[in-house]
């Protein structure tokens, strides 16, 4: 058999067979960077993805500053969007009851949330950062972020309006010299009718949020003055309203004269003889006890 011919006697070209060329069209713009890897090396260089910029900051200030600003100083982190399978609650209207602290999605990633452990909390579509009750809300502000974006808190307060009776500005002091910034914030809170609370750590800020929510339904008895109902306590409270007369002087007078009637009937000299009273206190007490009552028309 002739090596230059095939089985049918057709002459074949000398040398190795020629390779067929295939052209695969590849649109470089349709390949998302970092998702699909091209099968063939292209002369067009793809943009590199900086993975270091996607790392989550350690503090809330770094977390908020690293996000792009929207509008006039407003920050809404890109991580505030609902995750897959997570549906934020609808907006909680002022006056609506809830057993949980309603947290705005813009606070996602705030280290303060790690220390809110004693009361439940959940994300919801609300205007303030935290809704602590039917008429109580809170805005969170880092002093480090405030120094870089001083107009941010003004816009937040304007958007908040008068929807809540008690509005708390919870400030985390995370700078070395906070005096000037705190002075400006204190003045702003007075004009905006807000309550300014300072926290020196995320843990302390979390405790403030927990306390506001835990005491939402409790009465104000702990803050009110407790008045004793017994006779001695009521007489002591009455006598101590006289200038320079203290509780010790009141007990001395009651022990010396025995009753309020005899105390009123005593002369100025008798009052001055009481130990620890003196002529000046005796004169003031005598004048008060013998002044005529004012008639209210």
Curated annotation (Swiss-Prot):
Cross-link named Glycyl lysine isopeptide (Lys-Gly) (interchain with G-Cter in SUMO2), sites: 21, 37, 243
Post-translational modification: Ubiquitinated with both 'Lys-48' and 'Lys-63' linkages. Deubiquitinated by USP45.
Protein's name according to its UniProt entry: DNA excision repair protein ERCC-1
Binding partners and assembly: Heterodimer composed of ERCC1 isoform 1 and ERCC4/XPF. Interacts with USP45.
Domain of life, source organism: Eukaryota
GO molecular function, one term: single-stranded DNA binding
Entry keywords, A to Z: Acetylation, Cataract, Cytoplasm, DNA damage, DNA repair, DNA-binding, Isopeptide bond, Nucleus, Ubl conjugation
Lineage of the organism: Eukaryota, Metazoa, Chordata, Craniata, Vertebrata
Motif Nuclear localization signal: chain residues: 17-23
Organism encoding this protein: Homo sapiens
Phenotype for residue 221 to A: Impaired interaction with ERCC4
């Amino acid at each position: 058999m002739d090596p230059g011919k095939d089985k049918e006697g057709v002459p074949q070209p000398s040398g190795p067979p020629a390779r067929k060329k295939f052209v695969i069209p590849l649109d470089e713009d349709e390949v998302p960077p970092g998702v699909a890897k091209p099968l063939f090396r292209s002369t067009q260089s793809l943009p590199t993805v900086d993975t270091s910029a996607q790392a989550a900051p350690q503090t809330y200030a770094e977390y908020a500053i690293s996000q792009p600003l929207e509008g006039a100083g407003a920050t809404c982190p890109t991580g505030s969007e609902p995750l897959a399978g997570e549906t934020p609650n609808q907006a909680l209207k002022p006056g609506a009851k809830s057993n949980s602290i309603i947290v705005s999605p813009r606070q996602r990633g705030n280290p303060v949330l790690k220390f809110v452990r004693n009361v439940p909390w959940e994300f919801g579509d609300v205007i303030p950062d935290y809704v602590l009750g039917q008429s109580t809300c809170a805005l969170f502000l880092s002093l480090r972020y405030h120094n870089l974006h001083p107009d941010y808190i003004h816009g937040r307060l304007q958007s908040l309006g008068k929807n809540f009776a008690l509005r708390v500005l919870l400030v985390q002091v995370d700078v070395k010299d906070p005096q000037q910034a705190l002075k400006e914030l204190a003045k702003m809170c007075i004009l905006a009718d807000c309550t300014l609370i300072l926290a020196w750590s995320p843990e302390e800020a979390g405790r403030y949020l927990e306390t506001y929510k835990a005491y939402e339904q409790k009465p104000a008895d702990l803050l009110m003055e407790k008045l004793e109902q017994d006779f001695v306590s009521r007489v002591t409270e009455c006598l101590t309203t006289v200038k320079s007369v203290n509780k010790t002087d009141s007990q001395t007078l009651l022990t010396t004269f025995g009753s309020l009637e005899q105390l009123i009937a005593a002369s100025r000299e008798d009052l001055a003889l009481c130990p620890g009273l003196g002529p000046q206190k005796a004169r003031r007490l005598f004048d008060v006890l013998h002044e005529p009552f004012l008639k209210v028309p």
